[in-house]
Every structure is written in structure tokens, then in C-alpha cells.
């Protein structure tokens, strides 16, 4: 029995699932930290902070940077720095700086993962409505989808500012299913992190976990999605479609 035979729509996470956004996110985080005269983190570290929205990203960045600064000063025999600005206010300032810098680098620092466009096109051609659910701040979402030429595939897009409760809360997924006019159990959700899988389970949606994204350094199988794939086009055969690589070879 095909686990996905009752699927009537598919929704996707964005960062780490459809796009590699780490270069742009890391650049904006580091520019914001540098502007506040704090240590910069680097892409490898920032990747472990991605997934819960920009506010949480800023909190994680600031916590790390303040600790790193204290460690560096102690190593150099310098006294600790007394922060005149409370941490909450620093997070607010950091977020404002991040938004400015990310607006400048988002498009050039974001790339489609392999087979994404072909997979979305094949699903749309089959007549399945497609949705997008991301914790990314809403103002950045539409311009990014347009720049990557994938906005045309989605009938429903939910950004991080469009709901009160972000993933892993089920609300964004339930909203997408409602707008698609289908039951949650008829909507497949595809993501790369535990937030995605937890949201899908809470909403009652079947889930696909992808192995290549951003998941806080842990394996996606620990979140127990219904199915695990190494490439996004691996979900096509499960939905009754030819694998996109096979389709490409037929077209050559």
C-alpha cells in the first residue's frame, strides 16, 4: 500500500529544503554582529541556529557572541565588558541590523538545491496544489521566490509573520491545508528539520524528512518522519510520477 495514496496537496519548508540560504543568512548575521563590535560567527556555526525564525536566530547569535567576547577577553587578560544595553534591547537592535543587511544579500546568497524546480514543476503538472510554510520573515519570502523563479509553483505561501505561532506549532500547516481545501491528512509536508516534522505530526500531516538541510547538527531520522529521502525528487515516485532524472534522460 502506498503511504501517500490519499495525498491531495504538498507543502514545503523553504530554508534547507528548497533553498540553500545559509550563505546569505550567515553574511547578514555576521555583518550585524560586526556593526555592534561583537565577534562574527561564520556560516558553519550560523547553520546550527537556522530554523526558528529571525528573532530566535538573533537571540542565538547574541548569546554566542557575548560569550565568545568574554572568552576572548579573558584569554587576553582583559577585564570583562559591562554591557550598558540590556540583552533584549541588543536583540532588537541586532534584528534591525540583520533585516537591513539580509535585504541586501538574500538573493545573491540563496541557491536552489538540485532538482527543486523540476520536482515542483512535475507536482504542479500532476494537478497537486503546492504550498510553502517558512519561519523566515514574510517580507523576504516573495522577493526570494520570484528571484529564484519558483513563486509560480505555489498557490499558498505562509511566512513567519503571517501566523502567531510558527513551526513547530501546527497552525501554519493547518492554515495551508485549509486554504487548499483539503484535510490535513491529505497534505504531505516536506522539510529538513525537527521543527518541520514536529509541526507535521501535530497537524496530522504525513511527512517527508530530507537529509541534506539544516537540522541543528542532528540526523533527521531522530525526528521520525514517515519517509526519509536524500533528494527532493525522490518523492516523485511515491506520488505516482517518474523520477525527474529518468524524465530528463527521456527528454535528452
UniProtKB/Swiss-Prot annotation:
<feature type="active site" description="Nucleophile">
    <location>
        <position position="13"/>
    </location>
</feature>
<keyword id="KW-0868">Chloride</keyword>
<protein>
    <recommendedName>
        <fullName>Phosphoglycolate phosphatase</fullName>
        <ecNumber>3.1.3.18</ecNumber>
    </recommendedName>
</protein>
<dbReference type="InterPro" id="IPR023198">
    <property type="entry name" value="PGP-like_dom2"/>
</dbReference>
<dbReference type="GO" id="GO:0046872">
    <property type="term" value="F:metal ion binding"/>
</dbReference>
<comment type="function">
    <text>Specifically catalyzes the dephosphorylation of 2-phosphoglycolate. Is involved in the dissimilation of the intracellular 2-phosphoglycolate formed during the DNA repair of 3'-phosphoglycolate ends, a major class of DNA lesions induced by oxidative stress.</text>
</comment>
<dbReference type="Pfam" id="PF00702">
    <property type="entry name" value="Hydrolase"/>
</dbReference>
<dbReference type="InterPro" id="IPR023214">
    <property type="entry name" value="HAD_sf"/>
</dbReference>
<keyword id="KW-0460">Magnesium</keyword>
<dbReference type="InterPro" id="IPR036412">
    <property type="entry name" value="HAD-like_sf"/>
</dbReference>
<comment type="similarity">
    <text>Belongs to the HAD-like hydrolase superfamily. CbbY/CbbZ/Gph/YieH family.</text>
</comment>
<dbReference type="InterPro" id="IPR037512">
    <property type="entry name" value="PGPase_prok"/>
</dbReference>
<keyword id="KW-0119">Carbohydrate metabolism</keyword>
<dbReference type="GO" id="GO:0005975">
    <property type="term" value="P:carbohydrate metabolic process"/>
</dbReference>
<feature type="binding site">
    <location>
        <position position="15"/>
    </location>
    <ligand>
        <name>Mg(2+)</name>
    </ligand>
</feature>
<dbReference type="GO" id="GO:0008967">
    <property type="term" value="F:phosphoglycolate phosphatase activity"/>
</dbReference>
<feature type="binding site">
    <location>
        <position position="13"/>
    </location>
    <ligand>
        <name>Mg(2+)</name>
    </ligand>
</feature>
<dbReference type="GO" id="GO:0006281">
    <property type="term" value="P:DNA repair"/>
</dbReference>
<comment type="subunit">
    <text>Monomer.</text>
</comment>
<dbReference type="InterPro" id="IPR050155">
    <property type="entry name" value="HAD-like_hydrolase_sf"/>
</dbReference>
<dbReference type="InterPro" id="IPR006439">
    <property type="entry name" value="HAD-SF_hydro_IA"/>
</dbReference>
<keyword id="KW-0378">Hydrolase</keyword>
<keyword id="KW-0479">Metal-binding</keyword>
<dbReference type="GO" id="GO:0005829">
    <property type="term" value="C:cytosol"/>
</dbReference>
<comment type="pathway">
    <text>Organic acid metabolism; glycolate biosynthesis; glycolate from 2-phosphoglycolate: step 1/1.</text>
</comment>
<dbReference type="GO" id="GO:0046295">
    <property type="term" value="P:glycolate biosynthetic process"/>
</dbReference>
<feature type="binding site">
    <location>
        <position position="192"/>
    </location>
    <ligand>
        <name>Mg(2+)</name>
    </ligand>
</feature>
